[in-house]
């Protein structure tokens, strides 16, 4: 919007342009009566994003003004749509009195709604965190800060590589991300909504320290343990400045900053989070994820805490055993069943407290807070039976807070209106002065009923009624048929089609008295409402501790219920390297299968650090690998696991290289994606890592693929010594255990019955003898005639009777690996086919290609 001067514009438009110049990069909702209106480029953009009409509102400076508008009462729904698309909005309200204003009514921006700083219930995902983050980069090092404004949770970290930074962005998934104008690795910001460019000076260290000390009321940051994290502090300083600018109020619920140390967590990179489908499936949904199975929490704040645990598994055994002990007690005592309904009635206190801190809480927020506090005595009765130390600590923080509960019981009506604007929120008896003015206003109703009856009888007019509207105030209405009976002192105020309306001095006097008492009562109520915040805010820290304790009790109670219902066992955590699972099951697959799940063991230790896994397509190799990783992850969350028994050793990272698809947006092929993920593993895995490798090398020629798979497996086994599950269709790799120590072959078998195949899904020692590719192709619906032809050709290939076209020229491949027998072009092409990855159309095209090679 290029506006050089505002002088040629109307006074109202001059006011709009001034406010817009103060908020140039975001949409401005400009209040006009019962509408919020947008002009110029904002109007065009809003009409596209919200699918609303784009019109014109007169002209200014000789040009028509593009305009779009939305009703003020529907603003929350439109804000939700914009926030979901990564947009920010400045809300401009009328703050002046139209009756006393000369020129346009005074307006100002009262709040700025951004994706990462929303606190309104209607704009937030209930069971997921809503984070705002800031990222700082300097000479290959990163600083990263995140804030959940709905809880005050403020964290900082310093990822030391782009790969680690990308993993943090994937884990935290901020809805809004601040970065400096000179930020270099911009590819990290691609495919994201809510990116916000900020001035470089906002990331300066001295400015950041000053901002943070001002927020926390401290002289330095030593007490928080973050004083040496200079890059992280640069990001945190920008973040806290931005939040203050948008909220336009103090932030009393943000009282500390926490350093996230990588050494404390089991690190999951972006590919691993995606492949394990922790909280999001491969299609981007929530169905059939680990969180869907484990999250039966009673409160939304408990649900959010559980997801944080799942995305940040910890390595500290003391913390994990503390959680496991608590779950064990709740499970064995059956107390989880008593706690669930009590917790459900408490609700999402965490976010109510954030709105209280920002003084944006609505009447029903405080009513819900009151209702939550009323549940604590019953919950306290249940928690008295706790014996485990951590449960007792949580129970102590979740004790009833009688003073706050009593205050809210006295102050707030049982079912208050949505907003304070029209009053009727504070309970009768809370304030004597308010009651007196309310009584005066309410007594008016009785007076009017009495006046109506007296006037009707005095003048013998049975259609006479006393009424009120906002335009004409109080009036006496008489039907047209009886209007001739109206006495002389009745002054006509309004003529309707079927009635006449009058005013009398007595009624006018009463009107002034009533309106004055109502406005006086409303003014007192609004003042008392603000004073109520002043009484509650000193208790904010205690209330937040209570909310945090209830969240964790909810998660632990939920995990106890899941362990009991789903027949999970307690994992044993050891300091040694290794994984030993008996009767392991995939937590998600076993719940969605109609047939019984086949449980399988796994044993990994320094003498058996790599398993070469072979077997048919659809035989269960990927499921077996994923269930191992998920059980290890669940153990490091501190919850029970789907197994008969599980012994889980020290883990620093979990890597997965399972499946791949073209990354067309970045110009990367399937094979390029596969090799990038493999390179990441080979560079970053350690002897304490768990590595899952599935079908390495299948995206290129047989020789290249086998060479890469062999070399990768050998490197992991001999140089890194990582605990590795290596699934492959290259049967040549089953020779590896004969060449190197610490490797073993296992396979998943299948049984053929004529033309049918039955997958056993049971893991057995040793290598598989065939992959049953044609049987799987038949199951996939490849035409029987094609399968028949393929069987014939397979027999030819296996017997070496491969016809060579007269026109073909045999080219001997140089530098062939000694372990690979010389094979024909058709044989190579067949080995490269993986029916699991083919659509019916692709399968048909592949068969045509095979035929052309004969």
Curated annotation (Swiss-Prot):
Q: Does the keyword Zinc apply?
A: no
- Work out whether the entry's keyword set contains Acetylation: no
| SMART domains in UniProt | MUTSac (SM00534), MUTSd (SM00533)
Q: Which UniProt keywords apply?
A: ATP-binding, DNA damage, DNA repair, DNA-binding, Nucleotide-binding
**Record Gene3D superfamilies:** 1.10.1420.10, 6.10.140.430, DNA repair protein MutS, domain I, MutS, connector domain, P-loop containing nucleotide triphosphate hydrolases
For the ligand (ATP), the binding residues are 615-622
What GO biological process terms are annotated to this protein in UniProt? Answer: mismatch repair
Q: Which InterPro entries match?
A: DNA_mismatch_repair_MutS, DNA_mismatch_repair_MutS-lik_N, DNA_mismatch_repair_MutS/MSH, DNA_mismatch_repair_MutS_C, DNA_mismatch_repair_MutS_clamp, DNA_mismatch_repair_MutS_core, DNA_mismatch_repair_MutS_N, DNA_mismatch_repair_MutS_sf
Q: Which GO terms describe its molecular function?
A: ATP binding; ATP-dependent DNA damage sensor activity; damaged DNA binding; mismatched DNA binding
Q: Which GO terms describe its cellular component?
A: cytosol
Q: What family classification does the UniProt entry report for this protein?
A: Belongs to the DNA mismatch repair MutS family.
* Functional note: This protein is involved in the repair of mismatches in DNA. It is possible that it carries out the mismatch recognition step. This protein has a weak ATPase activity.
Q: What is this protein called?
A: DNA mismatch repair protein MutS
Which source organism?
A: Aliivibrio fischeri (strain ATCC 700601 / ES114) (Vibrio fischeri)
